[in-house]
Amino acid sequence: MTIDTVILDIEGTICPISFVKSVLFPYFVKQLPTTLNTIQFPLNLNINDTNSNQASIVQTLSKLPLSVTTSSESTYNYLKGLVDNDVKDPVLKALQGLIWKQGYESGEIKSPVYPDSIDFIEKFPKREANCKIYIYSSGSINAQKLLFSHVDNGTGIAMDLNPQLSGYFDITTAGFKQEASSYTKIIDQIDKKDNEKSVLFLSDYINEVNAAIESGMNSYVVIREGNTPIPDKELASHKIIYSLSELNL
């Protein structure tokens, strides 16, 4: 069956794993104290300018346990702990997206998407009318859109790949990435329930690949420089690629 739908992981698949751990996470932790110091604690949810980034941050923080948001210090310590332990918390992910937005818009952050990935994202949707690319990441959908709207293509001017993408999924809209039910939910949402084999999911994390395969879709392991090595015995039964240019779809 011909593959006409590709779902892409981000970190370690289409951009270096170091981008998240060495650029995005540290930027968030560095900016967090300044951001929290501009907010009144206990939280005031009656901010008139509901379109402001600060209002969005306050609304997001209000979803944390009340015992956490008694002060800027306690809020910082709680969030820093989530980051340090790589906890896939939806409130943290939403807050990260809001703070990263400032970095992207100021030009401090640009997304180092691999050239082969840029090429694939630009060309695959143009092959046939039904060829589509979706993104599935633990990061919030807003953070995903920011990443793809500020891609470093080597010209010094950020490029926007969002027009080539048909949709986005995160842990709030699909579920956790190591659970087969999450991929089943995506299959339903993109109207591929009776055509799962026309869908391909790409990830550097073998547990995600296994979960995707269990749902009925195809899935390949992507190996990139700097990724955590996967034992050969775990890779033995999987299709492996080292670049999206290897895809013959």
Swiss-Prot record:
Main localization category: cytoplasm
Binding-site residues, Mg(2+): D9, E11, D204
EC number: 3.1.3.77
Keyword presence, Hydrolase: yes
InterPro entries: Enolase-ppase_E1, ENOPH1_eukaryotes, HAD-like_sf, HAD_sf
GO CC terms: cytoplasm; nucleus
Binding site for substrate: S137, S138, K177
Alphabetical list of Pfam families matching this protein: Hydrolase (PF00702)
Coiled coil: none
Name the UniProt record assigns to this protein: Enolase-phosphatase E1
Subunit structure: Monomer.
Cofactor: Mg(2+)
Co-factor: note: Binds 1 Mg(2+) ion per subunit.
UniProt function note: Bifunctional enzyme that catalyzes the enolization of 2,3-diketo-5-methylthiopentyl-1-phosphate (DK-MTP-1-P) into the intermediate 2-hydroxy-3-keto-5-methylthiopentenyl-1-phosphate (HK-MTPenyl-1-P), which is then dephosphorylated to form the acireductone 1,2-dihydroxy-3-keto-5-methylthiopentene (DHK-MTPene).
Gene3D superfamilies linked: 1.10.720.60, HAD superfamily/HAD-like
Family, as annotated: Belongs to the HAD-like hydrolase superfamily. MasA/MtnC family.
Keyword annotations of the record: Amino-acid biosynthesis, Cytoplasm, Hydrolase, Magnesium, Metal-binding, Methionine biosynthesis, Nucleus
One annotated GO molecular function: acireductone synthase activity
GO biological process, one term: L-methionine salvage from methylthioadenosine
Cellular localisation: Cytoplasm; Nucleus
